[in-house]
Amino acid sequence: MQHYGVNGYSLHAMNSLSAMYNLHQQAAQQAQHAPDYRPSVHALTLAERLAGCTFQDIILEARYGSQHRKQRRSRTAFTAQQLEALEKTFQKTHYPDVVMRERLAMCTNLPEARVQVWFKNRRAKFRKKQRSLQKEQLQKQKEAEGSHGEGKAEAPTPDTQLDTEQPPRLPGSDPPAELHLSLSEQSASESAPEDQPDREEDPRAGAEDPKAEKSPGADSKGLGCKRGSPKADSPGSLTITPVAPGGGLLGPSHSYSSSPLSLFRLQEQFRQHMAATNNLVHYSSFEVGGPAPAAAAAAAAVPYLGVNMAPLGSLHCQSYYQSLSAAAAAHQGVWGSPLLPAPPAGLAPASATLNSKTTSIENLRLRAKQHAASLGLDTLPN
């Protein structure tokens, strides 16, 4: 005897098709009174189950069993208690085993297949929720990065404004050097008018060198150029600067007086002084020695060699200047002969003739080279 299980019920209780037909008629009459009543599938009785089927389906089911057609199962409606039990179990584990599913089915009065399918759907729902959360987090991170990027893009704008404001300040760093040069030029231009009274008192100076008739502005420019480039002090340029004993020494000493005394500047002053004395040395060999005021004039001219320079023996570089003074004494007795003041007006023609013979450019260049070679200044740094 075959038993065909339909939702927990067997068909062996039905003995004939007539009995089944009678049940069907009764169920149809009951369904007409309450057509909107659709209880849960598990709560349906056999009469209610048969009420939804046609007579042909009942005959086919009785003859061939329930496997002759594809069964259409209605959607299971879970109660609140069933859902609560299922959710608690899902919080414990997402993959319950068979034993856990059987117990849960007994507790919730649900078939084990429904429990298994519910867990499968619940896992799919959980994965979908996780993906949506990840997408939201990524979107928030992108928005945060975009806001940070905009903040960084906005932050450099004040920096660029500062950079645009800074270039005008860069030329402002040059004024100290420009001020220094302008001060040196101003001091040279101030020293140039001081030279002019000496030139006016010395009528022989105008007859000595025709190049001495340059304007004070030209002298100041020459001094500025000489201070800017030390290499410009060639023997040819040395012949232009010294004109008078006081005049040739005032310009460089005045411009150097604002800065500390250094070895390089002392060398420059020494070269200028020696170039100035080259034009004056030959006077001591041809003319009578200066009177008593000559020593006073030499003493008055000495402070212009530097910042109130002491005698060579009392300087810090004593050995260096002793060697220089020895070489200078060996060469024409430069330091021994005093700097001569302006001679009387009667000796001007004779001195002019001597000057025209001895102060030519070639002789002066030769004298400067010989003097530099004797002092060993060619090996010194320029």
Swiss-Prot record:
Q: Which PROSITE patterns match?
A: HOMEOBOX_1, HOMEOBOX_2, OAR
Q: What Gene Ontology biological process does one annotation of this record name?
A: developmental growth
Q: Which gene encodes it?
A: DMBX1
The family database entries (Pfam families) matched by this protein are listed as: Homeodomain, OAR
Top-level taxon of origin: Eukaryota
Q: Where is the composition biased (Basic and acidic residues)?
A: 133-153, 201-216
InterPro entries, A to Z = DMBX_homeobox (IPR052488), HD (IPR001356), Homeobox_CS (IPR017970), Homeodomain-like_sf (IPR009057), OAR_dom (IPR003654)
Which residue ranges does the Swiss-Prot or TrEMBL entry mark as DNA-binding? 71-130
Where is the stretch described as Disordered?
A: 128-252
- Record carries keyword Transcription regulation: yes
Could you tell me the keywords of this UniProt record? Developmental protein, DNA-binding, Homeobox, Nucleus, Repressor, Transcription, Transcription regulation
UniProt keyword annotation of Acetylation present: no
Q: Which residue ranges does the record annotate as region Interaction with OTX2 and is required for repressor activity?
A: 1-156
Stretches of Low complexity bias are at 178-191
Residues forming the motif OAR are 359-372
Q: How does it assemble?
A: Homodimer or heterodimer. Forms heterodimers with OTX2.
Q: Taking the first listed entry, what is the main subcellular location of this protein, grouped into a coarse class?
A: nucleus
Extract one GO molecular function annotation from the record. Answer: sequence-specific double-stranded DNA binding
Q: What subcellular locations does the record give?
A: Nucleus
Family according to the record = Belongs to the paired homeobox family.
What is the name attached to this protein's record? Diencephalon/mesencephalon homeobox protein 1
Record's function text: Functions as a transcriptional repressor. May repress OTX2-mediated transactivation by forming a heterodimer with OTX2 on the P3C (5'-TAATCCGATTA-3') sequence. Required for brain development.
